[in-house]
């Protein structure tokens, strides 16, 4: 089945900048995150699809390859999958160069491959994301063999020059009227072979190993942010540089607050008496409780801004705000006395659409009356 266009998956144009892509990813990731859709296989697949699109389109090199060649750009090297908490990566820098080199005879001795990049998906609470945290993670990886130190050869020996290509890493083959160069089938393009392989890594130069890392998450990170740990990916072949580890941040849904950029939003219920008469209530912030003054005659939906009570930007600068949206709660489970008091209060208003006490209701019912009057003319 044909893969869906990455831009369509995120709902952005092909000209979208990184900020637009990140914003789209955050919105969709929150919607389809497995924590919010437990047991929903379709949502889980959609979440993986969104993550894959985000990882390609926020990497300048991979995005350029995708824009030019589409999904075919990643079919040879394979990209790190989005499943689970851990995934492998690939270096795409030489995919097309190697193809054209083989065709036109421009092949060369294959260099020792840099280690693959790794990805670790880290879930954070909102509090951890806002304040910053240091976490220990354990990752499986390929590490340099501690016996042969990456050479692949038994201790006391060294790799020898390949007798087939004489160290060139390439052999010439005739195809019709053309002579082309291809990687040596004996040494696989390395130019050397291991006659006496290391007993521990069996000539690979690397061994499977788990390692524990301490990762410092800076204050202010958000869903979609990525932290790079240089050299903490898989070990390279034959002493080549190691890849990098990318920690991908995902902030869990919070029971009270919602975050948008550096602002926090929360919904604050008040009873109708306080809405009418005004008063003071305690509202939560990430730094503790603070008092919020409610003016008399406050309506449902009124938004109160508490400056500097939001999230401090991870890149420095001003701190966001906390925006509290008031919701007037209708009382329930009334006793007889309370019901009687409310009836008396309603009578004192002069009906449900009093011009003085309920101007919005008055305007609404006047509009309804005019609407029906116009229909009957």
Curated annotation (Swiss-Prot):
Can you give the residue ranges of the J domain? 5-70
Keywords, A to Z? Chaperone, Cytoplasm, DNA replication, Metal-binding, Repeat, Stress response, Zinc, Zinc-finger
Q: Principal localization?
A: cytoplasm
* Domain of life according to the entry: Bacteria
* Any single biological process term in GO: DNA replication
Q: In residue numbers, where are the CR-type zinc fingers?
A: 132-210
Q: Where in the cell is it found?
A: Cytoplasm
Cellular component, GO, one term: cytoplasm
Q: Where does Zn(2+) 1 bind?
A: 145, 148, 198, 201
Gene3D superfamilies recorded for this chain? DnaJ domain (1.10.287.110), Heat shock protein DnaJ, cysteine-rich domain (2.10.230.10), Urease metallochaperone UreE, N-terminal domain (2.60.260.20)
List the Pfam families: DnaJ, DnaJ_C, DnaJ_CXXCXGXG
Which cofactors, by name?
Zn(2+)
CXXCXGXG motif-type repeats, residues: 145-152, 162-169, 184-191, 198-205
Subunit structure, per the record?
Homodimer.
Domain free text: The J domain is necessary and sufficient to stimulate DnaK ATPase activity. Zinc center 1 plays an important role in the autonomous, DnaK-independent chaperone activity of DnaJ. Zinc center 2 is essential for interaction with DnaK and for DnaJ activity.
What is this protein's function per UniProt? Answer: Participates actively in the response to hyperosmotic and heat shock by preventing the aggregation of stress-denatured proteins and by disaggregating proteins, also in an autonomous, DnaK-independent fashion. Unfolded proteins bind initially to DnaJ; upon interaction with the DnaJ-bound protein, DnaK hydrolyzes its bound ATP, resulting in the formation of a stable complex. GrpE releases ADP from DnaK; ATP binding to DnaK triggers the release of the substrate protein, thus completing the reaction cycle.
- Family designation: Belongs to the DnaJ family.
This protein's name: Chaperone protein DnaJ
């Amino acid at each position: 089945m044909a893969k869906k266009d990455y831009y369509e998956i995120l709902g952005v144009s092909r000209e979208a900048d990184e900020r637009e892509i990140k914003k789209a990813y955050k919105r969709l990731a929150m919607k389809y995150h497995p924590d919010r859709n437990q047991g929903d296989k379709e949502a889980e697949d959609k979440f993986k699809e969104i993550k894959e699109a985000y990882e390609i389109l926020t990497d300048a090199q991979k995005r350029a390859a995708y824009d030019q060649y589409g999904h075919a750009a990643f079919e040879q090297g394979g990209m790190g999958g989005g499943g689970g908490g851990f995934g492998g990566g690939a270096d795409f820098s030489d995919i097309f160069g190697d193809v054209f080199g083989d065709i036109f005879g421009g092949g060369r001795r294959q260099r020792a491959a840099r280690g693959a990049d790794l990805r670790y998906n880290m879930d954070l609470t909102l509090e951890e994301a806002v304040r910053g945290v240091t976490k220990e993670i354990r990752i499986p990886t390929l590490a340099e063999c501690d016996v042969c130190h990456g050479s692949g050869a038994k201790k006391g020996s060294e790799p020898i020059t390949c007798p087939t290509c004489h160290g060139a890493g390439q052999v010439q083959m005739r195809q019709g009227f053309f002579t082309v160069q291809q990687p040596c089938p004996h040494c696989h393009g390395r130019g050397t072979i291991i006659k006496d392989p290391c007993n521990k890594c069996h000539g690979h130069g690397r061994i499977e190993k788990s390692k524990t890392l301490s990762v410092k998450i800076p204050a202010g990170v958000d869903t979609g942010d990525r932290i790079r740990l240089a050299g903490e990916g898989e070990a390279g072949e034959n002493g080549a540089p190691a890849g990098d580890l990318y920690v991908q941040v995902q902030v869990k849904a919070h029971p009270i607050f919602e975050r948008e950029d550096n602002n926090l939003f929360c919904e604050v219920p008040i009873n109708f008496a306080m809405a009418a008469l005004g008063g003071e209530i305690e509202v939560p912030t990430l730094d503790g409780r603070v008092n919020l003054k409610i003016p008399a005659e406050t309506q449902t939906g009124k938004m109160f801004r508490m400056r500097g009570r939001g999230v401090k930007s991870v890149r420095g600068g001003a701190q966001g705000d906390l925006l509290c949206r008031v919701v007037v709660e209708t009382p329930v489970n009334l006793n007889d006395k309370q019901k009687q008091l409310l009836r008396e209060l309603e009578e004192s208003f002069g009906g449900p659409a009093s011009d003085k006490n309920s101007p919005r209701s008055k305007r609404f019912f006047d509009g309804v009356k005019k609407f029906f009057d116009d229909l009957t003319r």
